[in-house]
Structures are given as structure tokens and as C-alpha cells.
């Protein structure tokens, strides 16, 4: 009988993720073993498998969010919070095709056509998603183009910068980990989550195009599965880097979520109006939100 694949990646100074092909995953610390007998001290060098790779990737996301899990805000969705989320969604998607093509070009230069082809296909699939967010903003009565030109939510800025930086590195394999993190989180959104957002929108208004596309109802689930298979096929050093970046991106994403979600309704509305240079009276007068109620979880 063939031996099951075991993969492991050191994530922090004292935590490694260990995953078996069977799907079993655990977090390993050096204190779990006797001195000088840590079986996971040396970086892995063997082949990967889909079962163990998904354990590493999802384990990295869980570990990234674990640091703030107890203080992670979980408010009910509101229109103002959702508008801020759509602006964030625009900024995390508008440069994705360009960045992925830039990374693909670098891998072609490095003689890695298989990685370049994967990234080029992802770039094609992500093209135009920023326009979905703009359509949703316009459907909510907001001048989307002007808003996104003048406003980037503070919690989103570090995430956008991270992706930009990853894609211009000499060896930009980490961009796959970043992309997986965002797509995996998006794929967790179910029909019920979209229905909650639709329920706070004005009647006969379709403002969930981006959210539907970036949920379990859209292409994200398929993208996640494809990425798992592709990462599993990579050399061990590449798999290690992808998993480590998945963790780093999860940290940034979690902190960004919380930064935006802890703002009051009034704070978010003030930011929107300052960016536009005008009041948004239809948001002030809406009966669906009030006072210091907290905002909606970002859409991307």
C-alpha cells in the first residue's frame, strides 16, 4: 500500500501546520516533541497531494484569523456598511488582472511556463469584476466611479499594497497564496448571506452582482478547487511559500475586516460623504439603519 502523503510548513517561529493526504490537519509546536527530535524541523521536500495541500492552505487561513477571532466584529449588514464593502471590493479587484499578468510574465522569464499559464488564465477570469462592484454602487444611488476614485477604505489599503508588492517580486509565487486566501473566504458565503444583503437593499434593486460572483454561488468554489490541485503539483519549496503567504494575507485580511467593521454607521457615512464632497440624504433618511449601529462585513 502506498504511503499517505504528509506535508508540513513552518508558519511562525513556534507553529507549523501538518496535513495528511487523508485530510487530517493539526498545528505542531516544538514543545510537542523532545529536544532535537522534531520531525517537522526540516522543510518538507516530497510531493504534494490535494488532500494535504488543502489542509495546509485552509489551516493557514484559520491560523491567520485565530489571532483576532475573539475580537472579530460580527455586525448585521447595513446599506452604508455594504457600500463601503463594495468600494473595498472594487479596489481589491481592479488591479488583479494586471498584477497577475505581471507575475505571469516574470515566470515566463524564469522558465516556468506552467505557472505563467495558470496566472494568465486567472487574469482572464478576473477581468471585469471591478465593474460589477461599480454597477452595484450605482444601483444603490451612489456615483460609483467618483467614489472609488476618491476613497479607499483604510482596512483595505494594506491588502491592496500586499498584492501589488507580491506581484513585482523577483519570484512572485506568493501571489497564489494571496489569491487563494481571498477566494477561499469568498467561497464561504452562502445563498443566505446574499439574501441578508438583498433584504436591506431597496425593493427592485439588484446590488449583489459582485457578491454573487464572489460566493459559493459564483465561480469561487471552482477556482478554489483548481488552485488546490495546481498548488499540490508544485515543487515543495513553492508549496511552502504559497502556504506561508496564505497565512500572511489572512492576517492582513482579518485585521482589515476588523478595522472597518468596528466603525460606527455615522463614521462610515462621514467618510463616504467626504470622499464625494456631498451629502447622501437617501442614506441619512433610510429607516433601515440608525445611530451608532456597526457596519456590514466586507463583500470581498
Residue ranges and their predicted role:
Residues 1-299:
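Non-heme di-metal
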Amino acid at each position: 500500500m502506498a504511503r499517505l502523503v504528509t506535508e508540513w510548513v513552518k508558519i511562525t517561529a513556534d507553529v507549523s501546520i501538518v496535513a495528511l493526504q487523508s485530510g487530517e490537519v493539526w498545528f505542531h509546536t516544538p514543545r510537542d516533541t523532545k529536544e532535537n527530535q522534531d520531525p517537522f524541523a526540516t522543510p518538507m521536500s516530497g510531493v504534494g497531494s490535494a488532500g494535504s495541500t488543502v489542509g495546509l492552505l485552509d489551516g493557514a487561513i484559520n491560523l491567520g484569523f485565530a489571532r483576532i477571532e475573539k475580537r472579530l466584529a460580527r455586525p448585521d449588514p447595513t446599506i452604508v456598511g455594504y457600500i463601503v464593502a463594495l468600494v473595498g471590493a472594487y479596489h481589491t479587484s481592479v488591479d488583479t488582472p494586471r498584477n497577475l499578468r505581471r507575475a505571469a510574465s516574470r515566470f515566463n522569464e524564469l522558465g516556468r511556463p506552467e505557472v505563467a499559464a495558470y496566472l494568465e488564465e486567472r487574469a482572464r477570469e478576473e477581468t471585469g469584476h471591478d465593474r460589477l462592484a461599480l454597477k452595484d454602487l450605482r444601483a444603490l444611488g451612489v456615483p460609483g466611479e467618483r467614489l472609488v476614485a476618491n476613497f479607499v477604505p483604510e482596512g483595505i489599503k494594506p491588502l491592496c499594497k500586499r498584492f501589488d508588492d507580491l506581484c513585482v517580486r523577483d519570484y512572485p509565487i506568493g501571489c497564489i497564496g494571496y489569491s487563494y486566501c481571498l477566494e477561499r473566504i469568498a467561497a464561504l458565503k452562502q445563498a443566505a448571506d446574499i439574501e441578508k444583503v438583498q433584504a436591506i437593499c431597496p425593493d427592485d434593486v439588484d446590488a449583489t452582482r459582485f457578491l454573487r460572483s464572489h460566493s459559493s454561488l459564483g465561480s469561487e468554489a471552482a477556482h478554489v478547487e483548481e488552485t488546490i490541485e495546481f498548488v499540490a503539483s508544485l515543487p515543495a519549496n513553492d508549496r511552502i511559500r504559497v502556504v506561508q503567504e496564505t497565512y500572511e494575507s489572512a492576517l492582513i485580511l482579518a485585521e482589515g475586516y476588523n478595522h472597518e467593521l468596528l466603525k460606527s454607521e455615522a463614521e462610515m457615512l462621514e467618510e463616504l460623504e467626504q470622499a464625494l464632497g456631498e451629502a447622501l440624504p437617501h442614506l441619512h433618511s433610510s429607516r433601515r439603519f440608525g445611530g451608532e449601529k456597526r457596519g456590514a462585513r466586507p463583500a470581498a
